[in-house]
Amino acid sequence: MSSKKKTKPVLPPGPVMVDVAGTTLTKDEKRRLRNPLVGGVILFARNFTDRRQLCALTRAIHKARKEPLLIAVDHEGGRVQRFRDDGFTALPPMQELGKLWDRDPLAAMRLATEAGYVLAAELRACGVDLSFTPVLDLDYGVSKVIGNRAFHHDARVVTMLSRALAQGLALAGMAACGKHFPGHGFVGADSHHEIPVDPRPLARILKDDAAPYAWLGDLVMPAVMPAHVIYPKVDAQPAGFSRRWVSEILRERLGYDGVVFSDDLTMEGASVAGDILARAEAALGAGCDMVLVCNRPDLADELLDRLQVQHPAASVERIRRLMPRFAAPDWDTLQNDSRYQHARRLQSQIVSG
């Protein structure tokens, strides 16, 4: 009698993205990643010591399931760049590209494409599938949490530069994720610690802040993350929990058919929806495809124990479309690529001023 090798079940990506505590997977984390409700893992600076360790971690995460989980990170450039040492390129804050646009629009677009390429190529060489970038918020000069993460105050400039950045990401096989729909730039409060309120009417928001989402669409921006901001003249709930915003405006009115990620459900801006189960149910009910639960493994486990949801086939297919379509070169091969070398030199010029 021949012995049969035990194989992992083929689980489709679930609607919950979780994180991990350190630089290797614990037994509890391996168990959590095998939960059918899990569809992805978000990494933070605490998960990185060097490239070798990061590659080992991403390999372990991908091997946890027969159909690999989506591995994501907030890696925009400037102050939001989780991996900074051991060869990772220092990328400029996106506001620097906006300043360059004011002097030379074509040079700014070229540099944005090169920035996207370097960002994605380095992450993919280490096994990361997606960066939650670019920021599409308009720079009104009032939001400290957004600040120089925003390209520009003009929606048309934001659209052009984010399109160029997305092209660079795509050249390295990575999808783009625009955030924070419909716009976080007009409010001063930080949704990590407060519940921001934007008092403007819908027409004004659609004309200005949400315009890049309408102009870009899901072919250029395959994923979107709504803001934990309340727009009381539109809906009493934050955008990420609002069926009006996600299903009626983003999907139906703007015709968007990409992945919609909730922002982190443990943020203060999400507290208005209730406990962790209520927050997840509200986000998924509004039309989000995947919800993020960060920095609270206890809440992640609570949600995975309590959430009862049938993940729609359309959501599963959208998430699968975010996975890279071709294999990435390893780090050493990438370093010897002349195109990458040139793109990296351009970043160093703008970072150093």
From Swiss-Prot:
Pfam families: Glyco_hydro_3. InterPro entries: Beta_hexosaminidase_bac (IPR022956), Glyco_hydro_3_AS (IPR019800), Glyco_hydro_3_N (IPR001764), Glyco_hydro_3_N_sf (IPR036962), Glycoside_hydrolase_SF (IPR017853), NagZ_Beta-hexosaminidase (IPR050226). The keyword DNA-binding does not apply. Its EC number is 3.2.1.52. It catalyses: Hydrolysis of terminal non-reducing N-acetyl-D-hexosamine residues in N-acetyl-beta-D-hexosaminides. Keywords: Cell cycle, Cell division, Cell shape, Cell wall biogenesis/degradation, Cytoplasm, Glycosidase, Hydrolase, Peptidoglycan synthesis. HAMAP family: NagZ. This is Beta-hexosaminidase. It comes from Bordetella parapertussis (strain 12822 / ATCC BAA-587 / NCTC 13253). The gene is nagZ.
